[in-house]
Amino acid sequence: MDVKAQVEVEKAVQILKLLGDKTRLSMMKLLQNNECCVCELVEIYKASQPAISQHLRKLRDIELVKERRKGHWIFYSLNKENSYYQFV
């Protein structure tokens, strides 16, 4: 396997591991058709703000989720341009 293919495999493994978490996977499905702020996700999942932010950071770091800032608010949505969007 060449280096580029190996890098792609490693990236796919990383993404699939992150999506193996039930909360993150359900967030991805929710964000597929909706843009949400952290406070909305806290209410939906009945979880702490730091916990929700941690999930979103992991999804943002691999570019499956994108953010849009409006004043003090940050809105999250699915990054449908990511080549791994199909896994969702």
Regions found by a protein language model. Give the residues of each.
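N-terminal positioning helix adjacent to the helix-turn-helix/winged-helix DNA-binding module
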Residues: E8-K11, T23
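Pre-recognition alpha-helix immediately N-terminal to the DNA-recognition helix
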Residues: Q14, L25-M27
